[in-house]
């Protein structure tokens, strides 16, 4: 009688642990897709060991000031910029087909979408008045996304040329 009681208790405990394990796995999978990004901060934009690439050149001067370097989900780099006077932008780079867009990037339909060439590169510019604006381009197997969540009027268009012509990503060696 005592042996069967222990057997039943062991089965109940096993069932509870199994249900808890399934719930943890399901919740963890949902958490990974809820918009939260795993970010690792770097001192410079060289993501060679983890991401397999480095940002070899990007704009940096008295009005375009990089201040933080990230690797997102081990595959997308992001450089945060202060744009004088008092604005912020971010530049994301990734191997072609691996770009991760910021949370809420496509939440609103873009009011204006244009394509144009800069230095032989096709650039897609998207913007909403007073909300998000971005430019996207592809060069040598890498994708580039320059965006601002709170842009100033025509800021993205004014910064497109220096970013498209001066930003390069290359494989890490």
Question: Where are the language model's segments positioned?
Answer:
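Feature marks short, highly hydrophobic, charge-poor N-terminal signal-anchor/signal peptide-like helices
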Residues: 1-12
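Core hydrophobic alpha-helical transmembrane segments of single-pass membrane proteins
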Residues: 11-21
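Juxtamembrane cytosolic interface motif at the C-terminal end of transmembrane helices
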Residues: 21-29
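Short, solvent-exposed recognition patches
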Residues: 30-134, 138-139
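Surface-exposed amphipathic alpha-helical segments
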Residues: 140-173
């Amino acid at each position: 009688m005592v042996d069967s009681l222990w057997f039943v208790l062991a089965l109940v405990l096993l069932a509870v642990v199994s249900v808890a394990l399934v719930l943890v796995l399901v919740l963890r999978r949902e958490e990974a897709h809820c918009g939260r990004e795993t970010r690792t901060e770097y001192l410079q934009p060289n993501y060679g060991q983890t991401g397999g690439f480095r940002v070899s050149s990007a704009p940096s001067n008295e009005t375009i000031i990089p201040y933080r370097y990230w690797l997102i989900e081990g595959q997308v780099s992001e450089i945060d910029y202060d744009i004088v006077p008092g604005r912020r932008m971010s530049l994301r780079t990734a191997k072609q087909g691996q770009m991760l867009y910021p949370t809420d990037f496509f939440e609103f339909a873009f009011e204006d979408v244009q394509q144009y060439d800069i230095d032989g590169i096709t650039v897609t510019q998207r913007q909403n008045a007073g909300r998000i604006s971005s430019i996207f381009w592809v060069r040598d197997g890498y994708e580039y996304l320059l965006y601002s969540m709170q842009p100033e009027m025509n800021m993205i268009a004014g910064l497109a040329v220096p970013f498209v012509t001066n930003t390069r990503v290359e494989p890490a060696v």
